Amino acid sequence: MKMELPLANKSLGQHFLRDSGVIDRICSDFKGQAEAVLEIGPGPGILTEFLALRSKSEGLPFFVIEKDDRFPPYLLQFINDNQITMTDALAVHLSAFFKEKNIDQKNIWLVSNLPYNISTPLLINFLQAPEIKYMTLMFQKEVADKVFPFSTTKNYMGSLLAITQTYFDCKLLCKVPPGAFNPPPKVDSAVLTMSRRETPLVPLSEFHALEKFLRLLFSQKRKQLGGILKASFPLPLIESSFNTLGIPLTIRAEALELNQVIELYRMLKK
């Protein structure tokens, strides 16, 4: 008999998924591709139970990282103690973690019902771990839309979209209403499924340089790009780059396409 679920900790952004259809869609992702599985923030093991069954049936190494010390007794219903690491996921150097667990040479699938209050910094960490080849992540809908705009036909470029899609191909797996959780959040959610590009648009070694450039580019979304960039780059270089791309200096960052953002980065970094 399973243990009764504890109360969710609001300060940690906890909302326990209870919709069996959504659980099944998440836990069935990347079949035949994943060679090892990491779950971040498993909580009382709602996804863990099914991920553990799948990992066992497919012979996949499976580990979880959890911060809340109330949850090991729940997790031990489904996995062993040596599969559980109790720490703050934001503080984990993922590549070192994978090496320690002897899965650094495998195609790793990362799964998480992300704590909504730290979903963006966690995602930024995940992007930088080359061992992670696949991700299935639950976001607050507003954040998911910034990673992969699925609720509008209009292109709204932003720094989170640009940095994520530089390294991963993204698509919507499913939308998730508040009633799918206990307690229900005040917002809608969405699950994105993400596959690492075989060749990233920008080398991972330049991640921080790209991140810095994107922060500048999107620092004042309503301001014209020519005005934003001239404080950091020579005007002749800006003008020649914009001419080459066929875009006006008066364009705003949110109107750019991803390929234009990347080309602008490449040209201006010279």
Go through each PLM region and give its residues.
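C-terminal lobe and adjacent flexible extensions of AdoMet/dcAdoMet transferase-like proteins
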Residues: 216-270
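Catalytic cores of RNA-modifying enzymes
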Residues: 1-208, 212, 254, 258
